Amino acid sequence: MSYQVHITSTAEHDIMRAADYIEFTLKNPNAADNLLDAATEQIGSLADLPQKFHLVDDPVLASWGIRFVIINNYLSFYTIDEEKQTVIIVRFLYQKSNWTAILRQGFSLI
């Protein structure tokens, strides 16, 4: 059964901010395009089997059902709403950021 994939406005902003940083600060538009392509592909693949990726190691975040997929040097965090058959992408953060603290501050599901 296929799931719908919903990207929150915060996660969309995260993705665009990452691509802008790579393109304009690092001056590497090809890498920015590659990141966007990889994000589109990996996030889209969650529609088929969202359970294939693990829960995060943090016990609090895991209790919230937060999973992640690695996309280049970034982590895309998501939850699964089994009742609605929906995957919700909540954040897209740099792998070396303090993502545990960022996620523990809370996030929007819209």
Can you name each region flagged by the protein language model?
Residues 8-10, 49, 90-92:
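Generic beta-structure capping elements
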